[in-house]
């Protein structure tokens, strides 16, 4: 049910907005990048630390013009080295690469750095879309780190 809700909300977001530059901070098998390319005219820069993710995503994305996306074999915590402009959409879909070693998961420390970079790089009015899966080894710690980051960020930067 969580996956369905994520996908439903994400697709509606893509269909209802005119994004021009997206970042897929956690490429995985390329599903989010595929959706961004399919439902928007955006260019996408996507990151993953596993070569297997890049290879499977290249296969999935072959129907799209290669000029519309860059797949980068590097951590999302280094995204500021690669961004050419301020993105108006940044997507995180944390956990592990389906069909691969479940011990290779999103690291809480690099995730925090990537979120900090995302907040600074995001175009005004842009969207950070974040999905966090739980249940795999290390997911609780990842969730705790993310919760702390978000609470501190909201407290420092947002007024209600």
What annotation goes with each model-predicted range?
Residues 92-113:
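Mobile active-site "lid"/loop adjacent to the S-adenosyl-L-methionine
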Residues 43-48:
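Conserved SAM-binding motif I beta-strand of class I
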Residues 1-19, 31:
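S-adenosyl-L-methionine
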Residues 29-41:
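Conserved SAM-binding loop of SAM-dependent methyltransferases across substrates and taxa
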Residues 125-132:
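Conserved beta-strand signature within the Rossmann-like core of class I S-adenosyl-L-methionine
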Residues 65-76:
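Conserved SAM-binding strand-loop segment of SAM-dependent methyltransferases
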Residues 81-90:
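A short acidic, Gly/Pro-enriched loop at the edge of an enzyme's catalytic core
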Residues 57-58:
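Conserved SAM-binding loop
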């Amino acid at each position: 049910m969580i996956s369905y809700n994520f996908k439903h909300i994400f697709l509606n977001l893509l269909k209802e907005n005119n994004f021009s530059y997206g970042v897929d901070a956690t490429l995985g098998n390329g599903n989010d990048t595929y959706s961004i390319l399919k439902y928007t005219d955006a260019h996408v820069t996507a990151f993953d630390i596993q070569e297997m993710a890049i290879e499977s995503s290249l296969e999935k994305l072959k129907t799209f013009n290669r000029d519309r996306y860059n797949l980068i074999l590097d951590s999302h915590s280094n995204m500021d080295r690669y961004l050419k402009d301020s993105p108006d959409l940044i997507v995180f879909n944390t956990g592990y690469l389906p069909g691969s070693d479940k011990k290779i998961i999103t690291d809480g420390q690099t995730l925090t750095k990537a979120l900090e970079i995302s907040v600074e790089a995001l175009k005004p009015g842009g969207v950070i879309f974040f999905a966090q899966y739980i249940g795999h080894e290390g997911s609780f710690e990842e969730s705790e780190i993310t919760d702390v980051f978000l609470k501190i960020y909201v407290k420092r930067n947002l007024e209600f």
